[in-house]
Amino acid sequence: MRRLQLILSAVYVFGCAFRCAFPVYDVPRICLFDHWLSSVIVGRSVATVAELCFVAQWALMLHEISRATRSMVGRVASLAVVPLIAIAESCSWYSVLTTSNLGHVAEESIWGLCVALLVASVVAISPRCAAHRRPMLLGWCVAGMAYVVFMYCVDVPMYWARWLADEAAGRRYLSIVQGVLDVASRRVVSHRWADWKNEVAWMSLYFSVAVWISISLIHTPQPEAHLATGERRRLPSAGPLRIASLDKRRA
């Protein structure tokens, strides 16, 4: 599991590093550099792959721990989050191509839902986890709930307000084909704070906190190490030597 976590994290960290170097404000096609690497189609493609890898890290970790703790809630959530985020990415592409922010409303709502599912899963498995692991689980829950609040109180309303403003102004949206041609060729270079200020909050968190979370998932202990001693003894594969090894590692 750790090798796969390393690969997934490497892809996500690379994607964030790339998007830090070539930031793009997708719908209005705003970028910092007049270079093909700053095109929306490149930036959005990198983001799609990176974000799927990031959520796959969480799904993998949650699936392994849920299997060890026999948590049905966690197991279902671990199987649901990647397909849900794939749908969210499709909504994002719809918004990017058509310039309609309604797709971003759906995208961010799904992200909030997925993180809420992850938090609920961690809450469900925490009673079966060792006491010294619970502060870490609590930290994940607090961070997750802060993210959910941010998404539904800040991010989703922001995109909803943009869509309403576009509707009131009678904006004409692009077709999918027109959008593909547009994101591949049009770049609006801007260094004005007014153009970027609404993007700063999520970009700052996304390219810092989320990166460290991704890296930390590589170092998550083996699933059995999360369990309380009594729970480990009930595992079918946990023989005396294995339990002793886990207890020694815990000490």
What are these model-predicted stretches?
Residues 23-27, 45-78, 86-96, 119-127:
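Internal transmembrane alpha-helix with an interfacial aromatic "cap," most often the third helix
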Residues 34-49, 190-200:
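Short aromatic-rich membrane-water interface segments that cap or initiate transmembrane helices
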Residues 14-42, 96:
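Helix-loop junctions on the outward
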Residues 81-104, 230-250:
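Hydrophobic alpha-helical transmembrane segments of integral membrane proteins
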Residues 84-140:
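Short helix-loop boundary/capping segments
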Residues 119-246:
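C-terminal transmembrane-bundle signature of multipass membrane proteins
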Residues 1-11, 68-82, 131-141:
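Membrane-interfacial loop-to-transmembrane alpha-helix junctions, especially the N-terminal start
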Residues 12-18, 82-94, 144-153:
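Aromatic-anchored segments of alpha-helical transmembrane domains
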